[in-house]
């Protein structure tokens, strides 16, 4: 670290919805010569993922504020004090010019200590319904940023930071116009598999006449591939040229761009990525998400005719098959264009610029 080099500390942990947008901003700041240090949990995915990106880690142990039983509630004051002490030591070691809170349990104690020690705090809320931590810290932060308008009062709508390649895909009008033949369907179950999608989609496709069936790429997580294959075979559909089952997709930008339609959950990052690429989507929100935030995430696009929202309790093979019969490449292209129009492709740059401004620095151009 040089004497003039600025330092950003990113606080984020727990799930990819917090970690991946944090990484996007971290890389943007590094490209501008900033030193970046990450504050996370040793038990979260960030502990293995972030160091692979060449970003040093500091650790805080904290399990959260929401009730998880009587013993956890009794231990909360001790755990919070311990986490605050760990956060204080980390801040003293790193001496950041600005701290960016991207969510996760550790953001609460670390955010409190950031403010109490006089360091500037920038918050970013990824979901359409703010989590408890950000609701509290938003009253103390220098700047508050949101991915969805209205998620927090008096916040700036920047969108969700995403990977650069997602924002650089060809416009949907050109992509869809260049295609012919069967529709292309991408089903994204994520690492957990989305059992409801794995069960309903094969049965829905079986209800379609062979010439009505789209070409399918179905991602389901390594643990669920065998069961998914059995579901397709039970529906009388063999996996081959028109049905490809994959455990993981490395290049999501290309996967989205090559699809006419995506069927998936509606986590904050998924919604942001689909809008950035510009692809038609049928969202089935995870019904047990905290505060049902996946429903309101999906509504942001669905209420503008930029996606379709179906609750899991309403999803059936018959409903899905009937809806698919009514779709054409033109109708899906129109949906994709509306989705793209609602995207915030410069979100990573905007969040980075805010961090730099709060630290009293300038950030050059776009990446």
Swiss-Prot record:
User: Biological process (GO) annotations?
Assistant: carbohydrate metabolic process; cell division; cell wall organization; lipid glycosylation; peptidoglycan biosynthetic process; regulation of cell shape
Compartments where found: Cell inner membrane
How is this protein situated with respect to the membrane? Peripheral membrane protein
Which terms in the GO cellular component ontology are assigned?
plasma membrane
GO molecular function, one example?
UDP-N-acetyl-D-glucosamine:N-acetylmuramoyl-L-alanyl-D-glutamyl-meso-2,6-diaminopimelyl-D-alanyl-D-alanine-diphosphoundecaprenol 4-beta-N-acetylglucosaminlytransferase activity
- Known EC number(s)? 2.4.1.227
Q: Which reaction does it catalyse?
A: di-trans,octa-cis-undecaprenyl diphospho-N-acetyl-alpha-D-muramoyl-L-alanyl-D-glutamyl-meso-2,6-diaminopimeloyl-D-alanyl-D-alanine + UDP-N-acetyl-alpha-D-glucosamine = di-trans,octa-cis-undecaprenyl diphospho-[N-acetyl-alpha-D-glucosaminyl-(1->4)]-N-acetyl-alpha-D-muramoyl-L-alanyl-D-glutamyl-meso-2,6-diaminopimeloyl-D-alanyl-D-alanine + UDP + H(+)
Q: Which InterPro entries match?
A: GlcNAc_MurG, Glyco_trans_28_C, GlycoTrans_28_N
Q: Source organism's superkingdom?
A: Bacteria
What is the protein's major site of localization? membrane
**UniProt keywords, alphabetically:** Cell cycle, Cell division, Cell inner membrane, Cell membrane, Cell shape, Cell wall biogenesis/degradation, Glycosyltransferase, Membrane, Peptidoglycan synthesis, Transferase
Q: Hey, which family's this protein in?
A: Belongs to the glycosyltransferase 28 family. MurG subfamily.
State what protein this is by name: UDP-N-acetylglucosamine--N-acetylmuramyl-(pentapeptide) pyrophosphoryl-undecaprenol N-acetylglucosamine transferase
